[in-house]
Each structure stands twice: as C-alpha cells, then as structure tokens.
C-alpha cells in the first residue's frame, strides 16, 4: 500500500542525500536560494542533456546558442520588459505585509474549489473581486489593503565604476531575447533555412515577490528555451507539433501522464505578443504548477527588435523569393521546475512487508545521478572491484561503495535512484561474471564482465 507523498519528504530526501542544500546555509541562508549538491547537479545536468539531445542534437531543424546574461538595455525596451514586466502588488495596511493581488485571488479560489483564470485581469478587476469576496490578509486577517500597483520584476545593476542611469543594466529575466537579437547571425552562419530553431540553456533572474515551494519558484533559475521560426500561416501547425514533442519528451522520461495536464490559454489570458499559448502543468504535492509553456509569439519579437535597432529581419525564401518576417513558436521550460517534477514523480515508498518499507527513486536511467554502483562483496575484493569501476567510469557516472552490508548498500542506492547495482563477489574471480541487481524490481542476474558496457548502453538508452 502506497504512503502519502509530501513535499516534506521530498525536501528531506533532497537535503539528506545531497541533491539540494539551502543557499548560504552557514550564514543563516538567503530566502529561496538553493545549491545543487553532488547528486542534484548530476540530476540537473542529465535533464539538460536529455533536452539538448532531443531538441538540438537529434533535430535536423535546430541549432544551439549561448547568449550573454547582460545585454544592452535597449534590448529590454524593445521587448517590453522595462515598461510591462511587472507583478500587481498590494499591502495590508494593518500588518504591512505585501502580497501579489493575483496570488491572493488564486489562493482564495483554490480554497473555494473555484476554477477561474486571473491572468489578464486589470488592477481594478482584481481590487473589486477582493473587496466583493471580502478576502482577508493571510497574515493578520484584516480586510484593509492598499491600492494595487505594478512592481517591475527585473534585477537592476550598474556596469562600470559609476552608478547612474547611463550605466544601468539588467540581469536578463528570460533567455529568449538573446536568441532574437542573434537571429540573423545564426541564420547566416548556420546556413539554415526557415523553418529552423535556435535553442539555449541558461540562467535567468526575476525579482519575484512570492517565491516558494522549494525549487519550484526562485529568483534565480535556469531555462531551456527553443525559438522556432516558421513561415506565417504555418505557425499553428508547428505550434501543435512542438506541443506534442514536449509532451512526448516528458512521458518518454517516465513522467506519469495522470500527473500531467495540458491547458490552452483562453483568449483573454493571452500575452500581448501571443496568438496561442498552452501550459503543461504538473500535479505537485502542493497542487498543480506550471511546468512548460508553448507559445505562438507570431512576428512580435523580430518586428520589435527591427523597429528599435533598425536591423531588417525580413527573410527571403531562396526558392520562391517570397519575403516575410518569420513567426516564432516558443517551447520554454524551467530546468529547476522540471527536475523537481521528475524528483517528485520518481519518489516512492514501497512496502515490502509489515516491518519493511524501502524508499526508492524510480528515475529514468537517463536522469539518474549514478547509472550504476560497483559494490565489492567484501573489502578483500576491493582491488578487482575498483578496476571494474575505473573501466565503467570512462563511459558513465558510476559510484563505488564498499561501506556496510550489501543489503544496506542496495537500499542506499535505491534511495538516490541508481538503476543498477553491480556486485563483485568471489565467484567473479573464477567466472568473470558479476551480479546486477535492478533497482525497481530488486531482481538479480549474472552477466559477463566483458558484456557489461553493451548491457548498460542498451538499458540507459533515451
């Protein structure tokens, strides 16, 4: 019988096993900052590798990019971030606590089992709703709020030795704009033709007012974004193609389909640049949370940058000579969020019998921090086991573990998601075979050492 999966259990495992630590912990921490430990950095890197493999490496359409975090501020004027990238804030007049108005409303709706979309509401609509429903301050219970005002989410800093408006720059709030400003550079040097895509993985920063839920919403985060450029009129076809592609990527990495829902935005929810948007939402223990967004951004971004920079982003079809500004389809996913979803989804407490329950992370082998662990049956077999470890570690991330009983070592690796434990015993000296123990089934089989690499290559495929 399965036990309840809670965020407390996930966070406890992540901290105790070296997946994720609180940031700056020895100085009391810094709110909503997290450091990825030895296992966490492997999980996160494996998520990024899996995305890059399917979206870039194996796609005949797409190429990669790594654009700078710091950009000319005119970039953010053109994209609309300086003027319109903000959250609606209000303060409780009694206790001076600060809240996002839309989040207050969403939390209230959740408590009432209502399904209403707040995106796109004006400040006045939100204020009226809060007053009519008599929504109270979550901190003190008062019903006396300030008017709603907009708060820009970009982190501002200065470049150079002086601090004035002429040296003001921003940490990027998204990776997409670095792709748009490099559109012509990539098109020219990669010799691609429309349709084609540019993908990148990188850090972004947003001064969120209500970050939380572990690594789900943080001020510093990593994105995996693809900007796919196509001919106007073919955009909805490509929009549906990338929606299906994203869904298959998640399911092929063993995310449970019943924990995933796909929600198309209503017209009133759409961003000013979007013709169509779909959110992939995952059912976390704290509720449904947005995992991935796929948007039809039309030609908005290229036209904005053309207008503000004077650069012509018109594309000429080499066969028909037709000229147009390409439309753009954007699948955008947060690395931290999707890694958390995989971690939550994989967590299982399996009841073996009345006295025995094992914790196991049923991660897809491609995502597992360690692909295998080499375990000598006794320390007397250490030299031979280490030799095997060194051979395997040339191709895979492998652990070597000789501490404790073999049963305890198995359970330890179940808990961190290692799909295969390889035991080197005394028989191995004679028959040159090892015992492979499978994480999910706990079944064991004997395999020739000479066949191990071929065996693991097949099992670790993605």
UniProtKB/Swiss-Prot annotation:
UniProt family annotation: Belongs to the class-II aminoacyl-tRNA synthetase family.
HAMAP family, alphabetized: Gly_tRNA_synth_B
Predominant location category: cytoplasm
GO cellular component, one term: cytoplasm
CDD domains on file: GlyRS-like_core, GlyRS_anticodon
Gene3D superfamilies associated with the record: Anticodon-binding domain (3.40.50.800), Bira Bifunctional Protein, Domain 2 (3.30.930.10)
Localization annotation: Cytoplasm
Annotated InterPro entries: aa-tRNA-synt_IIb, aa-tRNA-synth_II, aa-tRNA-synth_II/BPL/LPL, Anticodon-bd, Anticodon-bd_dom_sf, Gly-tRNA_synthase/POLG2, Gly_tRNA_ligase_bac, GlyRS-like_core
Function (record text): Catalyzes the attachment of glycine to tRNA(Gly).
Residue positions binding substrate: 100, 174, 221-225, 330-334
A single MF term (Gene Ontology): catalytic activity, acting on a protein
GO aspect biological process, one term: glycyl-tRNA aminoacylation
Enzyme class per UniProt: ligase
Positions that bind ATP: 206-208, 216-221, 290-291, 334-337
The protein's name in its UniProt record: Glycine--tRNA ligase
One protein family per Pfam: tRNA-synt_2b
Catalysed reactions, as listed in the record: tRNA(Gly) + glycine + ATP = glycyl-tRNA(Gly) + AMP + diphosphate
Subunit structure: Homodimer.
E.C. number(s) listed in UniProt: 6.1.1.14
Entry keywords, A to Z: Aminoacyl-tRNA synthetase, ATP-binding, Cytoplasm, Ligase, Nucleotide-binding, Protein biosynthesis
């Amino acid at each position: 019988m399965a036990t309840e999966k809670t965020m407390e259990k996930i966070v406890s495992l992540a901290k105790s096993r070296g997946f994720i630590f609180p940031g700056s912990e020895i100085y009391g921490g810094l709110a909503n900052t997290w450091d990825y430990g030895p296992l966490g950095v492997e999980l996160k890197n494996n998520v990024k590798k899996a995305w890059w493999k399917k979206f870039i490496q194996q796609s005949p359409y797409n190429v990669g990019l790594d654009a700078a975090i710091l950009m000319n501020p005119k970039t953010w004027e053109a994209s609309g971030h300086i003027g319109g990238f903000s959250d609606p804030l209000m303060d409780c007049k009694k206790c001076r606590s600060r809240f996002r108005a839309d989040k207050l409303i969403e939390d209230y709706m959740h408590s009432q089992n209502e399904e209403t979309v707040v995106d796109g509401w004006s400040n006045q609509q939100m204020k009226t709703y809060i007053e009519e429903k008599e929504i109270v301050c979550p901190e003190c219970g008062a019903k006396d709020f300030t008017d709603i005002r907009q708060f820009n989410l970009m982190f501002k800093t200065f470049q150079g030795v002086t601090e004035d408006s002429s040296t003001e720059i921003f940490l990027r709030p998204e990776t997409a704009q670095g792709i748009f400003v490099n559109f012509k550079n990539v098109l020219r040097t990669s010799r691609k033709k429309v349709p084609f895509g540019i993908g990148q993985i990188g850090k972004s920063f947003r001064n969120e007012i209500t970050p939380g839920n572990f690594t789900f919403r943080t001020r510093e985060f990593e994105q995996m974004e693809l900007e796919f450029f196509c001919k106007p009129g073919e955009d909805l076809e490509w929009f549906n193609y990338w929606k299906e592609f994203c869904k298959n990527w998640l399911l092929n990495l063993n995310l449970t389909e019943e924990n995933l829902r796909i929600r198309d935005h209503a017209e009133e929810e759409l961003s000013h640049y979007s013709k169509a948007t779909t959110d992939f939402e995952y059912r976390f223990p704290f509720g449904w949370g947005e995992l991935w967004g796929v948007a039809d951004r039309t030609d908005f971004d290229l036209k904005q940058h053309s207008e503000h920079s004077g650069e012509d982003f018109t594309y000429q079809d080499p066969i028909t000579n037709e000229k147009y500004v390409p439309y753009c389809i954007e699948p955008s996913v947060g690395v931290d969020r999707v890694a958390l979803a995989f971690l939550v989804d994989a967590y299982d407490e399996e009841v073996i019998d009345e006295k025995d329950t094992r914790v196991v992370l049923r991660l897809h082998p491609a995502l597992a921090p360690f692909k295998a662990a080499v375990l000598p049956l006794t320390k007397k077999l250490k030299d031979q086991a280490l030799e095997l470890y060194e051979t395997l570690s040339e191709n895979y991330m492998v652990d070597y573990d000789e501490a404790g009983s073999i049963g305890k070592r198995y359970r330890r690796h179940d808990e961190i998601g290692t799909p295969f434990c390889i035991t080197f015993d005394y028989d191995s000296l004679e028959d040159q075979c090892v015992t492979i123990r499978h994480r999910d089934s706990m079944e064991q089989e004997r395999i020739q050492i000479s066949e191990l690499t071929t065996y693991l290559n097949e099992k670790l495929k993605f």
